[in-house]
Amino acid sequence: RHPTEPDRLWRSFRWGATLELFILDARGERRPSTRTTRTAQYLSRAQMDWLKEGLLRSTARFKVVVNSVPITNFPFTFGNGEDRWEGYAAARDEILNHITERRIQGVWWLSGDFHLGCVGKLENSGTRSALREVLAGPGGQIPNPLYLSLVPPQFDFTTGENNYVTLRADPARNELTVRFVNGDGRAIF
């Protein structure tokens, strides 16, 4: 728990100069009534400012933002986006513009919720295409058949197979290795 804000869920954890995890609360502070406005609130102002400042000041080689739902701009329509970053365009633009305009290096996103697994670019082209996201899933859930529509060049890997995912940060090689392992223990990516 946070020492002065015991109900606050968002926080960060650091492993030396190698990795810093930024854990978000993207459910408890969201304001759906603002979704389509210029002031869309996906995260509270305090949490957004904390994330922006943390990413800017972090000296960790890899900065992994852990979020319950994806920030990727998917090439298909999946609902109206009210439950993910895509539905809060102003908030999504604020954090992604902050990262790209300040040239913050080593930022990755890790999320789930779509009942599929993938590794890909946040956007198919433009400055945000350098940012990457890993979706963990489907776990033990029924796979989302939309994984079949996630193809290169935006997506390097997609699966509907039940699996778990690991990340390995190697600062000496400047690599963050993503590994998906199926129920039989076989690496599928």
What are these regions (language model features)?
Residues 1-189:
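Metal-dependent phosphoester/phosphodiester hydrolase catalytic core
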